[in-house]
Swiss-Prot record:
Cofactor: Mg(2+)
Gene field: purA
Gene Ontology biological-process entries: 'de novo' AMP biosynthetic process; IMP metabolic process
Organism lineage string: Bacteria, Pseudomonadati, Bacteroidota, Bacteroidia, Bacteroidales
Chief site of localization: cytoplasm
Xref: SMART domains: Adenylsucc_synt
Textual note on the cofactor: Binds 1 Mg(2+) ion per subunit.
Location of this chain's protein in the cell: Cytoplasm
Family: Belongs to the adenylosuccinate synthetase family.
Protein name as annotated: Adenylosuccinate synthetase
Length: 419
């Protein structure tokens, strides 16, 4: 068996949570391979909305859910997340496994995150302040604490890390009150101890050999990747397909289908370049119809037309085999729909994604006829209006990959799987 990978192709918030919920019946194991609690996957289950930050989205389907070694885990937020799930998901401790190699977000990581961002002044990158960046910094500098450390001289390692962080905070002259946060953090560690802490790399590889199916679930989006995104306005981890290998411990040869998710338009939260951003009534219309507000931060998302330059790049980097288009229904009322097919940079046409996106980058659009049809009740692709079929064909020809799934609303039933 091979691992299927599901990831976002834009700046995050593509709708991965719903798609995982749709796909999980086919899989035995769902595994998160990177990121932290700065991104939320929104799912509807039993008429209730849930936002999952660290727990894989297969939890509602009774699957084995693995938090992989590439994830950074905040015990406080993990505890809170499990508490919101107890009414809908029984026996959580039997469904969620945590990699011993996953790194912990310490209470001082949150403080450092805020302190670093404050120091940047006008050059802020829009961090969520959840401590993800400092946790990954400790990881690569070989100073981090891992889940497995809970069972080995943990208090000594913890005290050493906290003392080092306090010194950094002192150097930045940052005022803080650690005690309440630390007290809550230590209570939350006791909750983590109830869950199975495993060598997830061995577990997943043995599962594949045994014929079990695995879906690797990414967080955020390709254009936020620390290497291939719009640096420095990116997240602190690799969000692309290759990260499923390093974040779960599986070989590249064991990667199978790569499902790439994108919206029928574009959104972005926080600072950073966004070539197709619309700061007019059209952008506001997209935001209102699409309810474009961060699932965790509640920040209004910046909205714009679909960017095929960035999307082609994301498809290439990830080796996408099947595309999934979300929120098609948001465009139902538009007379015309635009798509960015290239950039103009200093008077020159550019079809490849550039090293840096500055103010000189201007989108070059093509305009398509809108379908002007309420598609939220459609049950089959045969019911798609012709203009929407033309839009799908245009996207497939532009991206070189077929669109397998089309989402027409937030509910699981509003999902069309194409032949």
């Amino acid at each position: 068996m091979k691992v299927s990978v599901l990831l976002g192709l834009q700046w995050g918030d593509e709708g991965k949570g719903k798609v995982v919920d749709v796909l999980t019946p086919k899989y035995d194991i769902v595994a998160r391979f990177q990121g932290g609690p700065n991104a939320g996957h929104t799912l509807l289950f039993a008429d209730r909305k849930y936002v999952l930050c660290s727990i894989p989205s297969g939890v509602f389907q009774g699957k084995v859910n693995i938090i992989g070694n590439g994830v950074v885990l905040d015990p406080i937020l993990f505890k809170a997340e499990t508490e919101t799930l107890t009414s809908s998901c029984s026996n959580l401790v039997d469904k969620i496994y945590i990699s011993r190699k996953a790194h912990l977000i310490l209470p001082t990581h949150r403080l450092l995150d805020v302190a670093y961002e404050t120091q940047k002044g006008n050059n802020k990158i829009g961090t969520t302040g959840k401590g993800i960046g400092p946790a990954y910094t400790d990881k690569v500098s070989r100073n981090g604490l891992r889940i497995g450390d809970i069972d080995y001289n943990f208090e000594e390692k913890y005290r050493y890390a906290i003392a080092r962080h306090k010194e950094l905070l002192h150097q930045m002259n940052f005022q803080y009150d650690l005690l309440p946060l630390e007290r809550e953090w230590k209570k939350s560690i006791e909750v983590i101890k109830r869950f199975k802490r495993i060598n997830s790399d061995n577990f997943i590889n043995k599962a594949l050999i045994g014929g079990r199916t695995v879906l690797a679930e990414g967080a955020q989006g390709t254009m936020l990747d620390v290497d291939f995104g719009s640096y420095p306005f990116v997240t602190s981890s690799n969000t692309i397909c290759a990260s499923a290998c390093t974040g779960l411990g599986v070989a590249p040869a064991k990667i199978g289908d790569v499902f790439g998710i994108f919206k029928a338009y574009c959104t972005r939260v926080g600072s950073g370049p966004f070539p197709t951003e619309l700061s007019d009534e059209i952008g506001e219309k997209l935001r209102n119809i699409g309810n474009e507000y961060g699932s965790i931060t509640k920040r209004p998302r910046r909205c714009g037309w679909i960017d095929l330059v960035a999307l082609r790049y994301a498809v290439m980097i990830n080796g996408v085999t099947q595309l999934i288009m979300m929120k098609s229904d948001v465009l139902d009322t538009f007379d015309t729909v635009k798509a960015c097919i290239a950039y103009e940079v200093n008077g020159q046409k550019m079809e490849d994604f550039p090293f840096e996106i500055g103010s000189s980058v201007k989108p070059i659009y093509t305009e398509l006829v809108g379908w002007k049809t309420n598609m939220t009740k459609i049950k089959s692709e045969n019911e798609f209006p012709k203009a929407f079929k033309d839009y799908l064909l245009f996207l497939e020809e532009s991206l070189g990959v077929s669109i397998k799934i089309v989402s027409l609303g937030p509910d699981r039933e509003q999902t069309i799987i194409r032949e």
